[in-house]
């Protein structure tokens, strides 16, 4: 899989030099007055009704210039940590179907006061209706939103269709475009590149490297991690930033 992706990257690297875009993709990070945006001190997470914790004794700090990736085997609690952080910052349940009984059993999870978060969910099943209604609910400029989707190679013909008819890759592009256009202190992305084509991945990489927003993300693409990340948080062993 990785070999195929690397081959596609090599074949398409020249395209970024040759294609004249209407406008560069832009992200609009906000600058928080606090240096530390998130700090976990020896936290353990547990779901209500479960005898075993999701994970134990996790510590890390995320500052304004950090782009940290969560690492660990499937089921170790990466997405659960993102949900706990969102709830701690006052964002409630980020997507439908989440277990509301997740709680911090031990330790403390700090989020900076007034922290504004832009969240890209792993789940796309809640996307319904048309783009106009989606933009209205999210407070997004529809013209700018559609321009970003075009830059991510979503065909204009899709703009008039209901999003539940979109492919998984097209739905991901909707969430990424919304995430990009939402000004925030911290960008939380949960497996954003699932089903995303290589050319769009390269554009997203360049976007992050240009604007360097603070990020906490889960992503299995090692090349993407190494290109845009500043560190890692390993979950499953008394974790720390590396």
Regions found by a protein language model. Give the residues of each.
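Coupling and communication elements adjacent to P-loop NTPase active sites across diverse families
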Residues: 1-50, 63
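ABC ATP-binding cassette signature C-motif
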Residues: 32-242
């Amino acid at each position: 899989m990785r070999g195929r992706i690397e081959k596609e990257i090599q074949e398409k690297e020249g395209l970024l030099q040759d294609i004249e875009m209407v406008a560069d993709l832009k992200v609009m990070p906000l600058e928080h007055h606090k240096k530390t945006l998130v700090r976990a001190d020896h936290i353990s997470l547990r779901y209500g009704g479960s005898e075993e914790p999701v994970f134990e004794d996790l510590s890390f700090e995320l500052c304004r210039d950090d782009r940290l990736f969560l690492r660990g085997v499937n089921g170790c609690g990466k997405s659960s940590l993102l949900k706990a952080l969102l709830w701690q910052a006052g964002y409630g349940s980020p997507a439908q179907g989440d277990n509301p009984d997740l709680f911090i059993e031990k330790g403390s999870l700090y989020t900076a006061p007034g922290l504004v978060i832009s969240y890209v969910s792993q789940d796309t099943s809640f996307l319904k209706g048309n783009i106009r209604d989606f933009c209205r609910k999210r407070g997004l400029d529809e013209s700018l939103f559609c321009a970003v989707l075009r830059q991510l190679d979503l065909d204009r013909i899709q703009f008039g269709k209901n999003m539940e008819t979109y492919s998984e890759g097209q739905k991901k592009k909707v969430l990424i475009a919304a995430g990009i256009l939402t000004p925030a202190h911290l960008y939380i992305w949960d497996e954003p590149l699932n089903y995303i084509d290589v050319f769009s991945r390269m554009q997203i990489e360049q976007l992050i490297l240009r604007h360097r927003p603070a990020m906490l993300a889960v992503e299995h693409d090692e090349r993407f991690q190494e290109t845009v990340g500043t560190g890692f948080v390993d979950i499953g062993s008394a974790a720390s930033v590396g």
